[in-house]
Amino acid sequence: MKNKIIASLKERISRQNWENWFLDFNIRELKDNHVVFEVGNFFIKERLEKKFNKIISKVVKDILGKDATYEITFKEIPYETKVESGPLIKKRPLLITPLNPKYTFENLVVGEFNKFAYNVFLEASKNPGFYNPIFLYSGVGLGKTHLAQALGNYLLETDPDMKVAYLTSEEFMNEMFSAIKNGNIDEFREKYRKKADILIIDDIQFLIGIKSAQTELFHTFNTIHEAGKQIIICSDRTPQELKDFHSRMISRFQMGLLVKIEKPSSEDLFKIGKKISEMKNVEIDDEIIKYISKIYDNPRLIHGAILRLIAYRNLYGTLNLSIAESILTNVSKPPKSFEEKLLEILSEIFDCSPDDITSSKRTKNISYARKIGMYFAVKKLNLSTRDVGTIFKKSHSSVVQNVKQVEKLLKEGNVILKNYLKQIDKMSKGFAQGESM
């Protein structure tokens, strides 16, 4: 009977899906009209229950009767937290994941907005594990990645044998899924739990709603922390604002040191602009940099503005304040302006507040505003789904899903939706990129 159930499932599931998700699938127990299936890990269990529930249920009922039921379990793999002692073997330096060598403490502009964060990370680089974990959060483009990688680069400079693992949460998730698919999950865990001396996870907010990846990170976190190794988590929001995250994971983030990078002042932004031009070996007049620091409110945008001005000067051989103003006012407004303007427009049209739109509320008008706003930001403002996720405080996958839903409705000729988009386009008064609707 067990073989019959497996054979029937194999007939109904495509070869690719079978090879991806069912190679480790077997029946652990068959009693009366109840089947207990077993798979290799929690992630596959979660995937099968969501995507293949109807097929599995139908096969079980067809063979065992209409009252038959099933459940899926997974093999519990013990999580090792013990650090074994043994002879130290001098090995060639190993960088587990790449770092940008340009991110150093020396070229980081320090002001009142990031002084506390800078001092914490400098101390942590000299004494890893003293502040553990460190949870670093701030708005977009304020230097979280620079600070985190500066710590990693400092450690490698002072100890070339230090094994630093820096990656975004999305990279962690994708690597985990790939390891599961290819049967290399043990190697994946070995890499991050035992080989890494320091683990830096950037953009943790992109794991919102992805429970399987959160579970894997939870056990990785515990293993590294219990071994006394440094953990750094970077986010665009506080731990409490990580909605749809395991509470046990949030408690781990809160057990350490919470560090915030504040919004930089105009003076801070001017210093950052000067530093960027110095690093590019290009002299830009102070009046131009002052102008840039007034119209842009974060270091990333200032960096982009200076690159545009450098490109112009290299091409035409001249640059002054008048030219700079013309160049920078003829390009798109910075994402912060996009964010504020778009949320204001949506809140006005759908009779709700900007906070409602970025919240987890699911009332019809708020959900509709959020969905349409995401589509408009991706398709009309040409923002990446990652940036849109940051604006709306939602996961990357949620943005992709909402955009696809709107595309589907538009293809079906939804007149109401088209009218809403036209209204948003009209109210935006040209701040959107691309053609008008």
UniProtKB/Swiss-Prot annotation:
<dbReference type="GO" id="GO:0003688">
    <property type="term" value="F:DNA replication origin binding"/>
</dbReference>
<dbReference type="GO" id="GO:0006270">
    <property type="term" value="P:DNA replication initiation"/>
</dbReference>
<dbReference type="Pfam" id="PF00308">
    <property type="entry name" value="Bac_DnaA"/>
</dbReference>
<keyword id="KW-0963">Cytoplasm</keyword>
<keyword id="KW-0446">Lipid-binding</keyword>
<keyword id="KW-0235">DNA replication</keyword>
<protein>
    <recommendedName>
        <fullName>Chromosomal replication initiator protein DnaA</fullName>
    </recommendedName>
</protein>
<dbReference type="GO" id="GO:0005524">
    <property type="term" value="F:ATP binding"/>
</dbReference>
<keyword id="KW-0067">ATP-binding</keyword>
<dbReference type="InterPro" id="IPR013159">
    <property type="entry name" value="DnaA_C"/>
</dbReference>
<feature type="binding site">
    <location>
        <position position="143"/>
    </location>
    <ligand>
        <name>ATP</name>
    </ligand>
</feature>
<dbReference type="InterPro" id="IPR001957">
    <property type="entry name" value="Chromosome_initiator_DnaA"/>
</dbReference>
<dbReference type="InterPro" id="IPR038454">
    <property type="entry name" value="DnaA_N_sf"/>
</dbReference>
<dbReference type="GO" id="GO:0008289">
    <property type="term" value="F:lipid binding"/>
</dbReference>
<dbReference type="InterPro" id="IPR020591">
    <property type="entry name" value="Chromosome_initiator_DnaA-like"/>
</dbReference>
<dbReference type="GO" id="GO:0016887">
    <property type="term" value="F:ATP hydrolysis activity"/>
</dbReference>
<feature type="region of interest" description="Domain II">
    <location>
        <begin position="67"/>
        <end position="97"/>
    </location>
</feature>
<dbReference type="Pfam" id="PF11638">
    <property type="entry name" value="DnaA_N"/>
</dbReference>
<feature type="binding site">
    <location>
        <position position="144"/>
    </location>
    <ligand>
        <name>ATP</name>
    </ligand>
</feature>
<dbReference type="Pfam" id="PF08299">
    <property type="entry name" value="Bac_DnaA_C"/>
</dbReference>
<feature type="binding site">
    <location>
        <position position="145"/>
    </location>
    <ligand>
        <name>ATP</name>
    </ligand>
</feature>
<keyword id="KW-0238">DNA-binding</keyword>
<dbReference type="InterPro" id="IPR027417">
    <property type="entry name" value="P-loop_NTPase"/>
</dbReference>
<dbReference type="InterPro" id="IPR003593">
    <property type="entry name" value="AAA+_ATPase"/>
</dbReference>
<feature type="region of interest" description="Domain I, interacts with DnaA modulators">
    <location>
        <begin position="1"/>
        <end position="67"/>
    </location>
</feature>
<comment type="function">
    <text>Plays an essential role in the initiation and regulation of chromosomal replication. ATP-DnaA binds to the origin of replication (oriC) to initiate formation of the DNA replication initiation complex once per cell cycle. Binds the DnaA box (a 9 base pair repeat at the origin) and separates the double-stranded (ds)DNA. Forms a right-handed helical filament on oriC DNA; dsDNA binds to the exterior of the filament while single-stranded (ss)DNA is stabiized in the filament's interior.</text>
</comment>
<dbReference type="GO" id="GO:0006275">
    <property type="term" value="P:regulation of DNA replication"/>
</dbReference>
<feature type="region of interest" description="Domain III, AAA+ region">
    <location>
        <begin position="98"/>
        <end position="313"/>
    </location>
</feature>
<comment type="subunit">
    <text>Oligomerizes as a right-handed, spiral filament on DNA at oriC.</text>
</comment>
<dbReference type="GO" id="GO:0005886">
    <property type="term" value="C:plasma membrane"/>
</dbReference>
<dbReference type="InterPro" id="IPR024633">
    <property type="entry name" value="DnaA_N_dom"/>
</dbReference>
<feature type="region of interest" description="Domain IV, binds dsDNA">
    <location>
        <begin position="314"/>
        <end position="437"/>
    </location>
</feature>
<keyword id="KW-0547">Nucleotide-binding</keyword>
<feature type="binding site">
    <location>
        <position position="141"/>
    </location>
    <ligand>
        <name>ATP</name>
    </ligand>
</feature>
<comment type="similarity">
    <text>Belongs to the DnaA family.</text>
</comment>
<dbReference type="InterPro" id="IPR010921">
    <property type="entry name" value="Trp_repressor/repl_initiator"/>
</dbReference>
<dbReference type="GO" id="GO:0005737">
    <property type="term" value="C:cytoplasm"/>
</dbReference>
<dbReference type="InterPro" id="IPR013317">
    <property type="entry name" value="DnaA_dom"/>
</dbReference>
